[in-house]
């Protein structure tokens, strides 16, 4: 039985592990944390867990057929989203032909992380926790590296990236319904959001490439309280790791002698930074690459077909004059109700694999 090492027990790493175990491999997943979704050592959140909702457009049936994994038990339908865009508010109901879902991230039994972990264990995957890999040279060739936003893999493997900075607040709520609130405002050329699912709630304000001043956090905090009635007792300044959005050439399936998966591979939307869909898809492709580099590379390039277009759009968005940016954003959200049925899945064509699996 051939052995396979996977570094990182995130979504892509566990999807790869499940698929390889089903193919007869003896799979070991090495994870730096003490458990799946466990205590983190990232700057600003040392010794705490990240328990928050993560939203994504996704066709569950297609994803299940593609990856061999049905995540519907932990995917909560999201019907609408409140958007505060440069001083204007729009509540958007998602077009039914392009469904959106929230998944919980973290160590609780209701999270997608724990769900995939339990599936992996059922397939015979072994996990080695509190096992930080710093010497990648010691890993066997074709090891799968799926270390996500956080970790030491970016520089040793030569993957272009931008550091991400921001503020994060987390807590619990008695409200049963899932909820997402989005803010686009002049204080960041990225965005801020609030999400709640399975009673876990969190808010995040971030910026790629440069830190945000504390007064920016205070402004977002005030907006949430006044506009949405949402408050948190504690906000933490956080170094959020890195994103694969430094160059239009970021997506890569291989680095040195290794196979990349998830965020590290660049399989994500470079504009809105949706990551769940790409993580699941790239985990499957990484598993394919273990036995067939060429076929996996062709599939990787196919699902990431629109990354360059998305990168250029994100670059332009970052550089636009504020007045023009406001009008572009308002136009897009106002016209979503008729554009979405017209464009259907093309609305999210920059999302890796969306409408292509």
Regions found by a protein language model. Name each.
Residues 29-33, 263:
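Conserved acidic E/D residue at the C-terminus of a beta-strand in Rossmann-like folds
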Residues 76, 212-291, 295:
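FAD/FMN-dependent oxidoreductases across multiple families
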Residues 316-357:
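C-terminal auxiliary extensions adjacent to catalytic cores
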Residues 110, 114-232, 266:
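Predominantly flavin-linked oxidoreductase catalytic cores and closely associated redox partners
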Residues 2-29:
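N-terminal Rossmann-like FAD-binding beta1-loop-alpha1 element of flavoenzymes
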Residues 19, 38-85, 165:
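N-terminal FAD cofactor-binding segment of flavoenzymes
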Residues 51-58, 95-118, 211-216:
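Short beta-strand to alpha-helix junction loop
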Residues 288-327:
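Active-site-proximal substrate-binding core of FAD-dependent oxidoreductases
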């Amino acid at each position: 039985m051939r052995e396979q090492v996977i570094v990182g027990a995130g979504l892509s790493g566990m999807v790869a592990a499940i698929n390889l175990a089903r193919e007869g491999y003896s799979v070991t997943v090495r994870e730096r944390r003490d458990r799946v979704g466990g205590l983190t050592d990232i700057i600003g959140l040392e010794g705490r867990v990240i328990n928050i909702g993560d939203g994504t457009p996704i066709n569950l049936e297609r994803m299940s057929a593609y990856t061999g994994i049905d995540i519907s038990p932990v995917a909560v339908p999201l019907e609408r989203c409140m958007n505060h865009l440069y001083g204007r508010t729009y509540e958007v109901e998602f077009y039914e032909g392009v469904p959106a879902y929230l998944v919980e991230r973290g160590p609780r039994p209701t999270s997608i992380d724990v769900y995939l972990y339990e599936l992996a264990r059922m397939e015979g995957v072994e996990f080695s926790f509190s096992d930080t890999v710093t010497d990648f040279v010691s890993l066997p060739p074709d090891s799968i590296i799926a270390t996500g936003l956080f970790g030491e893999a970016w520089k040793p493997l030569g993957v272009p990236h931008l550091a991400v900075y921001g503020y994060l607040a987390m807590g619990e709520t008695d409200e049963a319904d899932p909820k997402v609130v989005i803010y686009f405002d002049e204080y960041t050329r990225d965005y801020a959001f609030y999400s709640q699912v399975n009673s876990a709630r969190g808010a995040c304000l971030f910026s790629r490439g440069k830190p945000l001043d504390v007064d920016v956090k205070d402004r977002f905090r005030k907006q949430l309280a006044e506009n949405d009635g949402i408050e948190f007792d504690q906000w933490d300044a956080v170094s959020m790791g890195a994103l694969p959005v430094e160059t239009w050439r970021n997506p890569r399936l291989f680095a040195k002698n290794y196979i990349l998966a998830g965020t590290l591979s660049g399989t994500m939307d470079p504009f809105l930074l949706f990551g769940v869909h790409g993580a699941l898809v790239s985990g499957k492709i990484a598993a394919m690459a273990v036995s067939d580099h060429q076929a996996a590379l062709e599939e990787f390039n196919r699902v990431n077909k629109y990354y360059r277009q998305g990168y250029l759009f994100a670059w332009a968005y970052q550089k636009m004059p504020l007045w023009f940016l406001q009008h572009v954003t308002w136009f897009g959200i106002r016209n979503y109700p008729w554009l979405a049925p017209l464009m259907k899945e093309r609305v999210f064509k920059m999302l890796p694999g969306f409408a292509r699996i």
